[in-house]
Amino acid sequence: MTNIEQERWSRVKGRLRTTVGEDVYSSWFARMDLESVQQESVHLSVPTRFLKSWIQTHYSERVLSCWQAEMPEVHRIDLTVRTAMRCAAPAKEQAAPIEPRREDNRAAAHDLRVSATAPVSANHEALGGSPLDPRLTFSSFVVGRSNTLAHAAAKQVAEGRRGDPVMFNPLYIHSGVGLGKTHLLQAVTWAGNSGLERKVLYLTAEKFMYGFVAALKSQTALAFKEALRGIDVLVIDDLQFLQGKTTQAEFCHTLNALIDAGRQVVIAADRPPSDLESLDERVRSRLAGGLVVEMASLGEELRLGILKSRVTAARAHHASFEVPLPVLEYLAHSITHNGRDLEGAINRLLAHSKLNAQPVTLEMAEREVRDLIRPQEPKRIKIEDIQRVVARQYNVSRSDLLSSRRTANVVRPRQVAMYLAKTLTLRSLPEIGRRFGGRDHTTVLHAVRKIEGLVSKDAALSDEVESLKRQLQE
């Protein structure tokens, strides 16, 4: 990919993010990559068939229009599924063009095939499990300050034995893209199944959905439910993609049945339970009742450790591959987005070094990873963070902000918090109202306008609001 194409792709992603909103973009488009640009067509890729089908069905026009705003000559978007190194590599599929409002119901049926790559036996054919990557084990996971708790909790789950008391259930791990959630979940599955004492099943939310739909169509829903409830440890990845009221209801019943029976459930998503707005309130409540752990962004020390680990792994197949420490330090300092970019950087250096028979140098690294060095993204601020910081600033409790109390010492902090939620997050007025004790959107709008008017006249309040913004953005 040329630098010009990379710049165009960055602008298209920016338009798409603005058009659909931050939450929709994070859920459906964050893992979309640009593969190539031709005269009248653009080739994009996504990691799963489910994402491909969903984007084609629901967002084809928007993706195409965003590209046409950048390149009017583009009339076609080809969307394919990236193949990844798995225990059993999936068959390559032909690129399918995105066409406006194209309905593709074959994708669901195609994905109902049994995947035998996850090492678990089940009594229902839809529970073969999702593919596991043999590289994603505890031994290859690099531990740092941002993921210590998540790693420790996952390790404890993996080392448990059948009949042991469950300390936290479910274990819910959330983070942004590429920070290690899937690595930990697959490590739990590999380790849990190694002793053959417990049945540990790894499923993506996509696989769960398709398995349930297949069971309904084949009239084997009861067998599907019984097979799921016979699992000792159920591991669900990318829960934010769970769609459909019927499927969510079945997931909720399964979750309750497993937890009530003392079986372990481990879940990962890209946001905390309270932010999974598409999920039923009962599901969010049950998820929040377990151990919720956030994996924060990777610090520079952890990034350096990941890079060293990837070099060591590469040397298992390429013994002469060497990356000088100054190069690793440069990469750790410059590539700050996620672990996948770090791995991609090592893969590029390996390919360039081997194909050109050249040693890795700092100049080579600067040239090869230029497009991976992104501007520092602003911190994503959550409504819970705003409520916590405002409550601390005004010496009230978070429950006061959510309550119906109308005393002056509570009303003003609540209005300030609503104002900050509107100005610092992408949440809608109705959603902000719901997060402040179920208030109407007109209440939020009144609070926003009230504080907007006051900060222009009240210097003290203006200073307080700016101080709160700085605290939240640090």
Curated annotation (Swiss-Prot):
Binding residues annotated for ATP, in chain numbering: G178, G180, K181, T182
Subcellular location: Cytoplasm
Span list, region Domain II: 73-130
Segments for region (Domain IV, binds dsDNA): 354-474
Keyword ATP-binding: yes
InterPro entries: AAA+_ATPase, Chromosome_initiator_DnaA, Chromosome_initiator_DnaA-like, Chromosome_initiator_DnaA_CS, DnaA_C, DnaA_dom, DnaA_N_dom, DnaA_N_sf
An example molecular function term from Gene Ontology annotations: ATP binding
Region: Domain III, AAA+ region, residue numbers: 131-353
Annotated Gene Ontology cellular component terms: cytoplasm; plasma membrane
Complexes and interactors: Oligomerizes as a right-handed, spiral filament on DNA at oriC.
Protein name according to UniProt: Chromosomal replication initiator protein DnaA
Organism: Rhodopseudomonas palustris (strain BisA53)
